[in-house]
From Swiss-Prot:
Molecular-function GO term, any one: G protein-coupled receptor activity
Positions on the Extracellular side per record topology: 1-18, 79-92, 156-182, 268-278
Primary localization: membrane
Function: Photoreceptor required for image-forming vision at low light intensity. Can use both retinal and 3-dehydroretinal as visual pigment. Light-induced isomerization of 11-cis to all-trans retinal triggers a conformational change that activates signaling via G-proteins. Signaling via GNAQ probably mediates the activation of phospholipase C.
Residue numbers of N6-(retinylidene)lysine PTMs: K288
Cytoplasmic face residues: 44-55, 116-134, 205-245
GN (gene name): RHO
Disulfide bridge map: C92-C169
Listed transmembrane segments: 19-43, 56-78, 93-115, 135-155, 183-204, 246-267, 279-300
Name of this chain's protein: Rhodopsin
Top-level division of the source organism's lineage: Eukaryota
Subcellular location: Cell projection, Rhabdomere membrane
Amino acid sequence: LHMIHLHWYQYPPMNPMMYPLLLIFMLFTGILCLAGNFVTIWVFMNTKSLRTPANLLVVNLAMSDFLMMFTMFPPMMVTCYYHTWTLGPTFCQVYGFLGNLCGCASIWTMVFITFDRYNVIVKGVAGEPLSTKKASLWILIVWVLSLAWCMAPFFGWNRYVPEGNLTGCGTDYLSEDILSRSYLYIYSTWVYFLPLTITIYCYVFIIKAVAAHEKGMRDQAKKMGIKSLRNEEAQKTSAECRLAKIAMTTVALWFIAWTPYLLINWVGMFARSYLSPVYTIWGYVFAKANAVYNPIVYAIS
């Protein structure tokens, strides 16, 4: 009880019908996510042609998403069944930590996937090819930095607390002290605004490079009086462009999923009167459901 902010006590209990809806939604997304990401990992690890340095990043993304749902899904089912957090204060902190950790690892893995596409498509032969050693180093950097940021609340820089209808736990965005808020300012920059800026920058140049390449191909085909100039090299470039589109889709879905939860954090800091348990819990659940999208995107592609 000492971890629950007084803001949540002013609201009446949530409509009992909401809990079965949350339970069904989490059951559906949990099974879909665990199965989809497991299949993604299995296929990429057991298909020789897919065991490339770039796909190590894809496997890391699937592992991060799998871990998120594996740790979020069962506790959420329990708390929705009992209509409140029943797993104790320690597990609340662990739960909040793991959710933040996996979300942070996912977006920075996507940033490195985007950067690899930028290197291949924009820089071309001038770019340094991604090696297994370099991809492994990137993955190590992702997890070390994510761990460092997400462990900070355990040492007094912000904290993990129950939120919304008290069936989930996350960072404390209702405390007004400057120390707690400073963490959210910096963390928002680190896991949202900076990745978004890098991604937009890379894809602006990727789109320009692809458009220039396609125009060059069409012009050359016209000069030669043929319909298409799709030789082996062109087919390879086309495949790289498809991979860039897949990466862009996964990144876009991540930002669509996590933007409502970011807004909840900032509304909690500056306009908490607009923050209700219903909006908060659905924003929270929608963000976690992002772990479902990636295997679907890769399967369709």
